[in-house]
Curated annotation (Swiss-Prot):
Heterodimer; heterodimerizes with GPER1. Interacts with YIF1B. Interacts with GPR39 and GALR1. It comes from Vulpes vulpes. This is 5-hydroxytryptamine receptor 1A. It is a multi-pass membrane protein. It holds the Pfam family 7tm_1. It is found in: Cell membrane; Cell projection, Dendrite. Keywords: Behavior, Cell membrane, Cell projection, Disulfide bond, G-protein coupled receptor, Glycoprotein, Membrane, Receptor, Transducer, Transmembrane, Transmembrane helix. 1D-myo-inositol 4-phosphate binds at residues 345-346, 352, 403-405. Residues 7-16 have a biased composition (Polar residues). A motif (NPxxY motif) lies at residues 396-400.
Length: 423
């Protein structure tokens, strides 16, 4: 968003322009040819990469059927929004930055500011919509499967654009100060104090708080599931070490009841270790081995499977079995830890990139209108902060799509033109 105009990072009569050029009384700087060339190359590269990256995401979702689901519809809509930023907003912003003054007239300036605020706000709110969708998916997976419909995605997308529209239109309807249009060489957003609070909180601070809460809860829910899986595996390992194994299914029933069986105390514990028998063995409370004896009807008599004697019993070999269980439990613990680290890393990248790109801009956008006479913002720093926010439109497709293996496969198909051959 165009909160700081080039050359107007401060309001002093002798301000430093970009790359050390000297400003005049209005803060507009004459720039050198080398500055214009370097700035044009840097900003041109940024715009080209942003257009290419977001266009590839849109093409991948449109061409690859496996990517056509509600979660990816939101990512696709984010890519369309960032593509609009890259095509409709960034070229005019780059021209303004390179020339260091506005040359396209007041009407175009109003349109530029409105598009800037609309598209950038919608892009930020799309990140909230994606966070909300992920939160519902992980905290209510069973019910949300039926609720996660294209219609719901369309409602979320429409809401992002509606809020963006409500934030971008007021300055065009007069919510601005007279000084906002006093300089024909400058094009800046309204510095009205009421609008400043309304726009910065609506476009950034409230969405930021919402994303922090949602991703915090997503992390807690994911960590709970991961640790629950580990505990379940550890319980299974403990059961195996304590000597519990499932009894074999009986072939016949006793007295008409399938699976007739009875428990008898056996001599396993007295022999100094578990004994292998023809029944399932478990430990009693007193440490004695209890052996399940399958009872079968043979003719008219009931026969019990013979209990093995202490001397003739075949000793089991639980050591290797227990070691295997311990290895499996340890492997699951390591996998769970790796998954937890990956969750932290992913959420850290998402929130870290968003905050890094937009927080400096919105701090300046909120503070500067309230201290115009006393605040000093170097012009170069103002330009860097401004374009750091714009660069979020370049980084979004990298974070939300290029790290996804399904998207990577679709991109490879696009590069190899496999979609063209299929048609």
């Amino acid at each position: 968003m165009e909160g700081l105009s080039p050359g107007q990072g401060n309001n002093t009569t002798s301000s430093e322009g970009p790359f050390g050029t000297r400003g005049n009384a209005t803060g507009i700087s004459d720039v050198t040819f080398s500055y214009q060339v370097i700035t044009s190359l840097l900003l041109g590269t940024l715009i080209f990469c942003a257009v290419l990256g977001n266009a590839c995401v849109v093409a991948a979702i449109a061409l690859e059927r496996s990517l056509q689901n509600v979660a990816n519809y939101l990512i696709g809509s984010l890519a369309v929004t960032d593509l609009m930023v890259s095509v409709l907003v960034l070229p005019m912003a780059a021209l303004y930055q390179v020339l260091n003054k506005w040359t396209l007239g007041q009407v175009t300036c109003d349109l530029f500011i409105a598009l800037d605020v609309l598209c950038c706000t919608s892009s930020i709110l799309h990140l909230c919509a994606i966070a909300l969708d992920r939160y519902w998916a992980i905290t209510d997976p069973i019910d949300y499967v039926n609720k996660r419909t294209p219609r719901r995605a369309a409602a979320l997308i429409s809401l992002t654009w509606l809020i963006g529209f409500l934030i971008s239109i007021p300055p065009m309807l007069g919510w601005r100060t007279p000084e906002d249009r006093s300089d024909p060489d400058a094009c800046t957003i309204s510095k009205d104090h009421g609008y400043t609070i309304y726009s910065t909180f609506g476009a950034f601070y409230i969405p930021l708080l919402l994303m922090l809460v949602l991703y915090g809860r997503i992390f807690r829910a994911a960590r709970f599931r991961i640790r629950k899986t580990v505990k379940k595996a550890e319980r299974k390992g403990a059961d195996a070490r304590s000597g519990v194994s499932p009894a074999p299914q009986p072939r016949k029933s006793v007295n008409g009841e399938p699976g007739g069986r009875e428990w008898r105390q056996g001599p396993g514990s007295k022999a100094g270790g578990p004994l292998c028998t023809n029944g399932a063995v478990r430990r009693g409370d007193d440490g004695a081995a209890l052996e399940v004896i399958e009872v079968h009807r043979v003719g008219s008599s009931k026969e019990h499977l013979p209990l093995p004697s202490e001397a003739g019993a075949i000793p089991c070999a639980p050591a290797s079995f227990e070691k295997k269980n311990e290895r499996n439990a340890e492997a699951k613990r390591k996998m769970a830890l790796a998954r937890e680290r990956k969750t932290v890393k992913t959420l850290g990248i998402i929130m870290g990139t968003f905050i890094l790109c937009w927080l400096p801009f919105f701090i300046v956008a909120l503070v500067l209108p309230f201290c115009e006479s006393s605040c000093h913002m170097p012009t170069l720093l103002g330009a860097i902060i401004n374009w750091l926010g714009y660069s979020n439109s370049l980084l979004n497709p990298v974070i939300y799509a290029y790290f996804n293996k399904d998207f990577q496969n679709a991109f490879k198909k696009i590069v190899r033109c496999k979609f063209c051959r299929r048609r």
